[in-house]
Amino acid sequence: MFLNVETVNHQGINKVTENQTENLEDLFLIPREIPKFLLKQILELVYDIEISGSHFIPKTGGAVIISNHTDYLDVPVQGVFIDRKIVYLAKYELFHPQEDILAYVENPKSPFSKPPLSLMKPMIRLLVNRMGDSFGKNLQHWGGMPIIRNHYGESMDKKAAMGYYNQLEDYMVDILKSGELLSIYPEGTRSETGVMGPFKALAAKVAIRAGVPIIPTGISGAHNMSKPEAFLSGAAFKAKIVYNIGQPIPPEDFPKSPEKKAAKELTEELEKRVYYLKEHYERRGKPRKFITKL
């Protein structure tokens, strides 16, 4: 069963309240500060990480933060070195890790298909489902937002897929209007080569619709540094990773064109700024001289 927008709307970015803690599952929610602290210690132990421009992150209020996407490391570097809670779009499967395990358990060719292990299947189902649900709820509690990345490919229904993405976009706008900081990687996927790819207009579009600032950032040095080969060769240890946060573009500086054209124009400008930030981190977020006023 695939996640739909109604499910996201009810299970989305939850803030624990006294009423919610009456639910048994909520008792197992881990405060975001704990994994954030532990992950930060690990990252600083392994890598040489430098952050600049942190003062550009607004203390409160909705905003979109964007970056180039070079490696799995990009998300934890951004998430743990920025003080504010960040909302992330993440594939549905990450929130339901039990599905692959249960599929293996139910496979007729697995060891669990015959006694004595088959007698344990009910207990395994219960335990795995509980653990998977708890893990998924914690990811949401920490800022994860489950989405289906290829809804058209799954549903084979273009109309339904378009409806899903339109509703998802509406939901992202609602998140921003509620005051959250939403992270989007405009390339849409990680770069296999480390070379920044063309930006999609989603980040600009939701920022325009929500009327919130958009913060360009750039990361360098992380490409391939989470791969086993980087650790085996020693390249990962104390590798220099720089995450540079640029000056936000406020809504009043957005293009005044119709929405679709404005999103295209803003995306082109953001692509230039992110490229500059990842290439010239030593400038510490100083404005790029040839960037035009939007």
Q: What is the meaning of each model-derived region?
A:
Residues 44-46, 81-83, 139-141, 209, ...:
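Short, well-ordered coil/turn elements that cap or connect secondary structure elements
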Residues 37, 49-54, 74-75, 131-132, ...:
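A generic local structural motif
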Residues 2-30, 87-114:
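Compositionally biased, charge-rich terminal segments
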Residues 2-24, 30, 152, 156-294:
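Non-catalytic C-terminal accessory region of glycerolipid acyltransferases
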Residues 34-42, 135-138, 172:
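Hydrophobic alpha-helical segments of integral membrane proteins
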Residues 61-157:
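Catalytic core of membrane glycerolipid acyltransferases/transacylases, capturing the structured
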